[in-house]
Structure formats: structure tokens, C-alpha cells
Amino acid sequence: MDRGLSTGAHQGDDGLRERTVASQSSSAPGLEALTATGEGEVKDKAGKGKKTYGRTPGGKVFTVPQTHDMVSQLLSPSEPKNLSDIIVLVILAAHILLLWRLPAGAKVPVFAFIYLFWRGAYNAGIGWLLHNQSNHRTLVRWAEKTKIFVNPATGQNSHANLYKLIKRELKTKIPADYSFEDAPIEYNTWLVFRRLVDLILMCDFTSYCLFAIACSQRPLDEGTLMTALRWSAGIILVLFNLWVKLDAHRVVKDYAWYWGDFFFLIDQELTFDGVFEMAPHPMYSVGYAGYYGISLMAASYKVLFISILAHAAQFAFLVFVENPHIEKTYNPPPPRKRTIDQENVSITPQRSDSPSAPAPLDEQVPHAPSYSSGPPPSVHNLLGFRNLDLYRTIDTSSILIQFLVFALTVLTPSTPWFQFLFVANAAVWRIWYSVGIGLVLDRQSNCKAWTRHFVKYGESPQEAWNQWKGTYHISMVMCYASFIAAVWKMYSFPADWGYGLVLLRHVLGAGLIALQIWTSVSIYESLGEFGWFYGDFFFDESPKLTYDGIYRFLNNPERVLGLAGVWGAVLITSSGAVTFLALMSHILSLGFIQFVERPHMQKLYGRSLRRDAGLTKSLKRSLPPSLQQLHGSVDKIFDESFEFIEELIDTARPKLAAGVNTFVKDTSALFQKYPARVTISRIDEDLAGYDSRDYSLEVEGTDSLSPNDNDQSGREGANARMPLDRRGDLKNLVFEYGSPIKVKWTAPLNHSKKDWIGLYRVTDNTSREVTRVSSQGRWIAVNEGSYDNLTCEKGIVSSDILIPASQRKDNENRDLASGEVIFSGDKLFWTQGVFEFRYHHNGKHNVMAISRPFEIRISRFDEDEIPLMDPTSVELSLFPVVRNCFDRDPQIAPETVDEPFGSLVERDGRYAKRIVFAVHQMFGIEFAPEVVKADGNVHNLARRICNAKRVLAPYSLTKNGATTPTEGKE
């Protein structure tokens, strides 16, 4: 419902800390710009309303009639009512009646269960339906299979009464511009889906309110003033929630409210205003403020906790259902660049700042280095658990330092002396993190002091950048580790959780901590590694501001939200010392923004900075003119005050800079399978009449270049060294890694339309009659339209082609049906091994035929023939493997060794992982997937392989020293 979709792009003109995002395409605004799929009318030049047009996935264009929201349809007397409305109203009335009739002791548990049921139906039920509709068009396929929208007069629909009921229900709700018979099946399916959504959403909200009523109470020791304040705050939150819902519906209309883009798209101009300028995904974030308002009015922790649970479930719905669909629908990867700028290639065939493999060692000659002004490619990121690398000094140092800090925290007593030490330590680190780092960045902004220091000793700007990232990372880790340690020392476990506001303080504190974590993650997602570490202080090439993610709504999210967690710690501890640390942290953070970030951003971006973010604009528009003028006067006072402080600091800056410079010179820096699934084998008892001799599977694929590698290594006995004696002309099937595999099948003419073919390892199944291992998505149906998803039909080439009995090789006199399917991409095993295909009966796991076993093998590069690792030879060997790893998709697979990879490689890590596995098997070199993304084409990757082989040659265990320490040929 929320969709979070009307967060579209708007042209900004100011903002801080929204830095240049290196190595990111400008496609990000495309996601935001196209995700507000409101159903407002497209208007002509005269301003007259025009019709809205929709487009189905098949390309059919139709008129989208005007519809109304569910509350108006159900409760407004002016709206026509039908059977489904009456059913919903009766169910709602039953909920209210149940609350009235239940005994007092049963109301709370019963309505807690009822609400959790409807909340599960919303987030899990509707989420499952939408997920399958997005990926497999499941709801539309159900409608196609049951033919419920087909006129029974045609003889194709046997449910005449159901057809009449649905037709009457839909036409009653949409009297104009709607024809049930002519509307696309996608639109009719969406209308039926809406009725289910109406039922679930109305019951969800009603049961929540009834649960709150059942839990409502007034604390015994609460005064009249506190009661009035509690109810006033609750009512304000509920009214704010109501405004958010109404304004969001005004913008997105019913189309996005009911997830219409899961079924079809509409052609119209997009509008971005109101609540969608205030917060990301407002219906799922600030749109749940009313839940906490109701919790306040009910004065019940039960209502508060169930509200938090519901809010968390709604965010899970957003993350796992809506966001993947939005990304797929509105932000597809840009097409791959098929041509290369020949002029640039001829002049500078290998730019120094391009993400390419390093030059061979023997080609390097002493000369003055030329430094690139552009940022280095981001290959090995620093932040995040997935980027943790214990071989990297900064990561190991961070872990060791944190371990020592927390060990000291736990092992030392919480006496006043130790509490003072830990608070002082946290204060020192906060001062360094804000003031010390701020001075370093200020000197870097004005005179490139940090970079000059490393260039002075012959290092590159990239090395200065890497060292800076380590320094900043350690400082940030120690700042927060020391703060957490101080909080731990000042915290005392409550003796009575029910006393006063103890429990509420802990809940609010945990919420603020979660808010800071979410803010930090959002900032990192928007800025990337480059912006997080203030990359535009170090590299000035082509500065460009981007306002997306959290920066669409706030210029400086770290100004308030970025420090919410420290105030959460204040609430939890109720300690004066922690309050002092939080206040100091906030003041220093504001000073850092004002005196370090703002001057640099103004110098670098000038007038391209916007003055007001989306939230600020919305709040200003809501103020009366007199208050807007007052706001401007206050801003002027603050600006003048900050200018005075800046002048004061400028006067004292030389002395401070000299001290910091001495300190820097005299100090040296220190320091993911799918969960196992229980698979129940489904055995069909109705196998009578099917002859297994009528079923067969024949496999065809691209033969491996060296299918006989290592067949005879000299380790065998005398008899085993003799040439292989084959009885027949069948040879071993050995296919290339990742190449598509064609499977030809035969079956009786009366075979089940739900038959399917699966791919398995030969060792996975001990039974030849029943498959007891999950295919994990590696299966294809033999007929189209038999299953409720489209994925299983990808790969079908032909079905039910008649083979006369005269053409059978086994001399049987029965005709057969035949077909072809092609397994490719995700339907293959991306590893080496021996595999087989199995033909299964009627959607179950009964095996009717098994193919010949075949091997998937990656041919090892023959270094004896080319001992010098010629890059051209490596390119020729690597190129077909890379194309296979990219599923031979023209959008991402290159046509030549110099063509760049498609942009999807940057988003989906599986492609790069396939390549690094193949490289490891072919050349004995292990790369990280990020290397493939950074190199960008086969040519650069081949050069990197050659260089790596040369570098590691001295450590080789083979005779000629041409390979790395791996299992070599003997």
C-alpha cells in the first residue's frame, strides 16, 4: 500500500555532505524519478482532464477507469455497495461484537491473536502473492488457467455463476469507462486482488484498534496533567498519521495504493510533493506514527510492543517485496556499451585512472610517475561485515582494539575512578574524531597537506587516500567503542522494570539507537565508500552533486538523526556523564559540519548547493507567512554568529595548524548458502498405463576443449594405462563450464502436461525411481501454462512434437511426443562435476527417464606450450568462458575482449563470482569478485592474470615455476 514510490527526483540546489559519489552511474535518479506511480489524470494544455492509459506486460494499451479508496467505498453512503462490501462490513461488525461479548480476562489474548493473524495475512500473505506476481505473474496465470474472466457462452468457462458474480461486483464499483469483457486480464485480476486487500487491511486496522481498547488503562499514580498531555500527544500523532495517509493517497491514488504496477503500468506524468518530500517511504515510516499515538492513549506496553512488531513486519514487507520489484521495474541496468571511443584508444590506450590490471613487471622502467587526479576504483571496500578481511592491517587492528577496549570494560570494576577514566577516554576520542579529523580535513581542503606529505616521499595520491581511510576508520571505531564502554560503565541494571518510566526509557532508547544505525546505513548507501571517507577532499575531478536516498529529504542527516543513538544511550542510562558526552558529541558534530564541511562544499560546488531539502521545504510551506519571516531572521542571526566564530578560528589557525602538523609528523598509524530445505518427495500413485520405454532424454552441449585431461597421469597400474576399450561409439560427455545444455525428450502422447525435467549431481540421488533431492530451481516444465510461474518455462524450445512409430529406434509401434528444452544461466550448476537430467511425472518426483551422465569441466590453461603467459593466449582461452559466465546475454556479455561488461555485473555479484571460480580453476590464481568489476573487460582481466602469475612465480611448487602453489600436473 505505502509503495514508498513517490519519492521521485526533484531538482535540488543546495546541501551538505552529499558528496560526489565515485564510480556510480547516474541511473540512481531513474529509480527515484520513476517510482512514484500515481494515478493522477494526464491533462492537456487547456487543463481539462484526460483519461489515464495503462499498458500490460504484453503491450496492450487500455483506459484505466477512475476508482475510489477503500474507506469511501465501504463507509460512504454515496458509494454503491455490493456483496463484497457487505461481507467486509459484517466481518468488521463481528470483531466489534466479539470485543463486547468476550469476558474481560479473554479480550487481550484473543484480540492479540486476531490482530497478529491479520497482520500476518497482510505482510506474509499479501507479500507472498505480490512476490510471486512480480516474478512469475502468478495471480494472472491463475486467472488464465481458471478462465474466470472468460464469458461462459464461449464454452471455455465452466464457472458461470462465479463469472456473473465477479462481473456484477466489478461493474458496480466502476460504472464509467469500464468494460468487464474488454478489459485486460491483468486489470481484472488487479480489481479482484483489491477486494482481498480491502478485507485484510480493514480487518488489520480494526483488530488493532480493538486490541488497544481491550488493553487501555489509566496508571494508578498518574495525575490529571499527565493524562491530558498523554492524550494530547496521542491525538496529535494519530492526526498526523491520518494526514500522511490522505496526502499519500492524494499523490499516488489507488494505482500505487493497491500495488497496481505489479500487474500493469500506466502512462502519465509523475508528481512528487506533499508527504513524499518529507521522508523515505512515508507510509511505512512516519505513516505508522498513529500506532504509537494509540499506544500512548492506551497507556499499555502491550499495545506499544505489538505496534513495534507490526512496524518491523511492515519494513520487512518493504525490503523483501516492494524494493526488489521497484528496482526491477523502474531501475533496470543501462544497456552495455558496445563501442569504444577509437580516438581515445589510439591516443591513450590505457588510461592511468581506469580500473585496469597493473602493468607487467618486466615492462616497468624507472621514470617519473604520473599521478591521476581521479579517484581510484573501489575494489576492496572497508566498511561492512562482508568486506571484513583479516589479512588487511586496518581490519585486524580495528578488531583487536575493540576487543581490548571491551575486555577492559568488562574486567574492571565500575567504581567512580574507573567511570571517570572511561568517560574521559570517550571525551578525548570524540574531540579527536571531530576536532582532530576536522583540522586534518581543513588543511587538506585548503592546501592538500595530507596528500602533499605522501607525495613528498614518492607515494601516490592513491596511497595517501588509502592511508587516510585507515586513519579515519580507526578514529571512528575508537570514538564509538570508547563511548559504548563509557555507557556500559555508567549503566546500572534496573531492579524493577515496572517502576516509573524505566521500561519506556529503554524502549525509546533502543529505538533511537536503531534510528542512528539506519541513518548511517542510508548515508553509506547514498555516498558510497568514496563519499563516506570525504573523497572530494582528496580528488577534485568532475565534482557533481547527487541528491538521492536519505539526502533527498535532509541536507545533513547526521546533524540530528546521525546522533540519535547517543541520546538513546542517555535515555537508557539516565546518567549525567553520558548526557555530557552526548551534548559534547552533538556540539562538536555541528561544529564539524559548519566549519569543515560547509566551507569545503561551498568552495567545491558553489551555487549548485541547494538551500532547503525536501523536509525543510514541506515544513516551510506549512508555516504561515509571519512565521516564515521569523524563520529567515533566525537563520540570519545564526549565520552572523557562525561568521564571527569562523573569524576567531581563522585568527588562531596558524598556531593550531603548526601543533597538529607536528603531531602528524611524529606519529605513525597502527592498526556468505541457501538454508537447507526439507524436501518431501511427492510420489504419484497413478502411473498405470505409462511405459518407461516411451520416455527418454538426450543431452547435447558445447564440448570441452580438453575432455581427456588427467585421464592417465602415470599413477595407474599397468592395465589401467592401456587405451580405453569402448564397446560402442559413445564417448564421454564433457561440456564447457556454463555453456547452455540442450535436452531432447520423448514421452507418450498422453503424458501429463505437468511433467518436468530436473538437473542433479549424479551422487545426489541413490534411487533411480524417485528423486529425493530438491532441484533448487534447476528444472524446466515440458509444457507451457502448466505451472503458476514463468521461471520454470524459461528454456522451453518445443513441446509435444509428434514422432511417428515408424521413426522409433526401439521398433515399438506407438507414436511419441517429443520436445526440447535448454538449461542455461541459473538453471545450471556453476561448478565442476558429473551431472544428470531426470524426467519426472505429473509434477511429482517419480522418475520416468534419466539421461546419460555428463561432466562439466573447466579446461586448465596449458602453460607448457606458452610458458611466458602471453596475454593474447590468455584472452583467447578466457573469452568464451567469460561469455558463458554472463549467460551469453548480449546485454552484459562482451562481443570482443576489449568490450566492457554490462552494468548488471556491478549490481549482481553472481556473475563476477562465476568468473573468479573459472579463473582459479584455469590458471590457479584466486581473485576477489571485485577485481572482475574493476577490470571491466576481458583484456584487462587477462593482463591482470599474467601479472599475478609473474609475481607469484618465485613461490611456485612446479618445476618451471610457472604456476602458483596449487595442485599441478605431474
Swiss-Prot record:
Reactions mediated catalytically: a 1,2-diacyl-sn-glycero-3-phosphoethanolamine + S-adenosyl-L-methionine = a 1,2-diacyl-sn-glycero-3-phospho-N-methylethanolamine + S-adenosyl-L-homocysteine + H(+)
Subcellular location: Endoplasmic reticulum membrane
UniProt keyword Methyltransferase present: yes
First-tier enzyme category under EC: transferase
Entry membrane topology: Multi-pass membrane protein
Pathway terms, separated by semicolons: Phospholipid metabolism; phosphatidylcholine biosynthesis
Biased composition annotated in UniProt, kind: Polar residues: 342-355
UniProt-recorded Gene Ontology molecular function terms: phosphatidylethanolamine N-methyltransferase activity
Entry similarity comment: Belongs to the class VI-like SAM-binding methyltransferase superfamily. CHO2 family.
Protein name stated in the entry: Phosphatidylethanolamine N-methyltransferase
Organism: Neosartorya fischeri (strain ATCC 1020 / DSM 3700 / CBS 544.65 / FGSC A1164 / JCM 1740 / NRRL 181 / WB 181)
Gene encoding the protein: CHO2
